[in-house]
Amino acid sequence: MKPENGAATWHPAKRSCLGRLTTLETLLLVFLGLLITALLSVLFLWLWVLDGYKTFTDGRPIYPLPFENSSVAVDRSAKNHNDVVCTSRECVRLAGFLAENLNSKINPCEDFYEFACGNYGLNKNLPANKPLRHTISDVQSRLNKQVKSMLQSPISANEKPWDKVAKGYYQKCLDEEELESTGVEAMRDIAKRIGGWPTLEGDKWQEWSHSWEEQIALVLNLTGVNAVILEMAVTHDPSNSSRSVIELDQPKWGAGSRYPYLSGANDPMLRNYTTLMKMTAVALGADPAIAEKEMNEAMEFELKLVNFSADDMVRRDPERGNNRFELWQLKSVFPFINFEKYLKTVFKELVALSPNHTVIVREIDYFVGIQHVLQSTPKRVLANYISWRLVQGFSPFLPPSAREPFYQFKANQTGMFNSPPPDRWEDCVTLSVIMMDMPVGRLFVENFFEKERAMKKMTELTSYLKNEFIKQLHVLDWMDEITRRRAISKANMIEYKSGFPMVLFNDTWMEKNWGMIIKPREYLLHLTIRVKLVRFTEELLRLDQPLDRSMWFQSPAQVDAYYAPNNNEMIFPAGIMQFPFLTLGVPNYITYGMVGAVIGHEVSHAFDDQGGQYDEMGNLNDWWDAETEEKFIEKTRCFVRQYENVHVVEADIHLNGQLSLGENIADNGGVKTAFNAYKAWKSNTTGISEPALPGFQNFTSQQMFFLAYANNWCSLVRPKHYIQIILTDVHAPSKYRAMIPLQNRPEFAKAFQCPIGSPMNPERKCQVW
């Protein structure tokens, strides 16, 4: 109780106690109190740091945590990061990933790929049966093991039917003993169903009485095998993305690329391909002499077809392939191909085709050219070729001894002579992800995907990336205002889908689509065909129906990302949303540099030389001002020249700047947009420095962003495989996807203080977006 006059109350006992202390003891007691206060202050400061600098300014944290349960420590060497280093398990793991690849002896301004990825080859081996290895394939390998662990577990009675069918398919695929005893029989049975393989049957083969058009329609209806002589699809109408149309196109070729065919039958790859055809026929029971003669004839027939086909670079223009006909008009343009008979046989009673149904013919010259070839080719040759392509497509279902030549053919294409075949489980995982896409995807999401945190992070990333791309559109000096408004409208309307389709966890939908039962002793090949035909029937039934834009056309369990121009949407499956691309619990300079650049890449695809021809609704539409379009084309020519000037020493070949143009535009736009998005995120969070990664205390956040980006593309490639990539792949080899976009970025040169004219800071740079 306080006295009225405010004087302190006297306590004699306490005074007596203090009174007995000497002056020295009093000073020591005061010092002890100060020491305890100082220690408590240090402890409080330490807890403050561990809690992620949760100091508030204007109601917001100076350093907002990019993840939960962070762990950081003070490190005076981390001058660029306010003396703070991240010590969480995620940060340590990511730092180890970067450090393992880093070659710090290289000057980053001389060769940044070698700086960032130079030790990748020292710490990673290139398997004898692989043509290349890179960061993406490493993630795919880990995902394959994750899928394997789920599918190999025993099937229990109380499991969902779609889980049972996915596991049952995989486990049946693994049964090599069954394949050894039934694989040839199952394949011969399928060949018999489609009219027989003459090479196997010899003189006993009976020629079919119907036309070749009806024959390939029959093959499609009975097996789901499509791209033989021609390829048919029910797909988006290029001019009206809300509806579906029939599309007819040239097929894919048995040897892969069309390039070896251009050299004729004596091309080494085609000789290997013809040998494969003969060996397969003999493995299935053909007389070697008959196989020799008739597979040569089949090869010559395919060669004639390829001669009328279009080059991939020419096919890049979507407007060129938008050749629209009504069904009744096809006869006048292609008088010797009965497309009406073919299509009506394919659709049967599922959809009633009228003469006015729209048909898109992507390659008019191809179909005009092959008419006379097909007229003059004996049915026996046609039947041999069709049967061969059927068996080739189903080669994973052959016994091991009959599969071996297929592995060797592929290996020889990429310089892997006498390489061992992959383990069977790898093939079976791949087949399961393709054939059981949604059941396997659901299992993967349930077991290995952090849905809430990952989806939340992707929402943040896509929002920042989209906003930054739109900001870039606002300041382009070569784009007129009308085109700019349309471009901004398109960018705003891009739909971002990440993780998995919502129907994946709709049990009713899963039961309807994947409630099938594996029949006792059903051949693996027959089960596969049964699944293919269900999916193919669904495709046919989409004709004339409103398009369901919520559909996904690949499994969530895939390491991939893509932009679909006819839907104006981009999809990021759960498979790519994992370490190292999306590592939850690391600073954002890593996240934006890795998966952020992937998002930026896909955003840029909406405006590359192909995607830019589609409007905001996904319709093929000339929405560009003519002068602006010419300026755009001129800027893309800079990329073509830049990439084609690069000489790949390992294969003594230059990059193909035209074939890879769309991907190069996207790579360059992607890293720029991701870097600007990171800066925007940082600005919106008061700009405080994020913690360093352990071992990278001397790097700035900007340097770490570019280091993370380059680590997307660390790779090992066999020299011969470089040739195949450059001639046939729309992507540049990984090394150059890391290097060239950074050579074009002034922000990179500034971050590493690269002098103008140095290899990583050339005077002439290319940029579109």
UniProtKB/Swiss-Prot annotation:
It is an enzyme of class 3 (hydrolase). GO terms for biological process: protein processing. Its cofactor is Zn(2+). The active site is at 602, 667 (proton donor). Its EC number is 3.4.24.-. One of its GO terms (cellular component) is plasma membrane. The chain crosses the membrane at residues 27-47. Residues 85-769 form the Peptidase M13 domain. Zn(2+) binds at residues 601, 605, 663. It holds the Pfam family Peptidase_M13. It is a single-pass type II membrane protein. Residues 48-769 are extracellular. Glycans are attached at residues 69, 221, 240, 272, 307, 356, 412, 506, 684, 698. Binds 1 zinc ion per subunit. Disulfide bonds join 86-91, 109-754, 117-714, 173-428, 638-766. GO terms for molecular function: metal ion binding; metalloendopeptidase activity. Its main location: membrane. Residues 1-26 are cytoplasmic. Keywords: Cell membrane, Disulfide bond, Glycoprotein, Hydrolase, Membrane, Metal-binding, Metalloprotease, Protease, Signal-anchor, Transmembrane, Transmembrane helix, Zinc. It is found in: Cell membrane. PANTHER family: NEPRILYSIN-21, ZINC METALLOPROTEASE FAMILY M13 NEPRILYSIN-RELATED. Belongs to the peptidase M13 family. Probable cell surface protease. This is Neprilysin-21. It comes from Caenorhabditis elegans. The lineage of its organism: Eukaryota, Metazoa, Ecdysozoa, Nematoda, Chromadorea.
